[in-house]
Amino acid sequence: MAPTVVHVAPHPDYEAVGCPGALLHLRDRGWQVVSVIASLGFPEQRDRRRAEAEEASRRAGFVPVFLDPPLDISVGDDLALATVRVAIEVPEIVAEYDASIVVSPSPHDVHHGHEVVGRGVQQSMATLPSGLRWWMWGVWGDLPAPNVFYAFGEEDLARMLHILEAYQGELERNDFRRLLAGRATANAVLGSERVSVSARPPPAPSPTPRC
């Protein structure tokens, strides 16, 4: 049975924006990638955004799973209730697919909807097997201490852009292709530097008091 990673996207298209390089890297090495879509936007958008997410999953080779009903995570919604739903429903999905890794936005990703999903996954970890790993990504806010870096090339980026382009309705609103390519360019320089800095041990205490 193939090992499984569950990615929890706060909105459709973030499976193609958050950390698509790492997900595709696992997919290419035999992992099953379960793409959980937590919300579908405003009611009048839901049919379109679900269809776009299904097409993106087809392009990526991911298994799409939609929370039902979709989360309401706009400003003014009951974000505490949405957090509880994530904390309850993610373990059920992890158990169904026997996942080894859960991936989500950081609980500190600045965007309120991203943080709802991140906090919900964080709470769910208390009920999940101790051997399961939780990976976080940051888009709206940088991770404070990143410890995983996956380098990829232009062909990989073109593949990610092809997946993202399934979201034509969202790209008309805001061209996230520029964000995906720009983050890749920036992290080609900063990524390994930030991971190596985070991995350094703290300085040893001074053997003698210093004032």
What residue ranges belong to the model's regions?
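The feature marks non-catalytic terminal segments
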Residues: 1-3, 52, 56-64, 77-81, ...
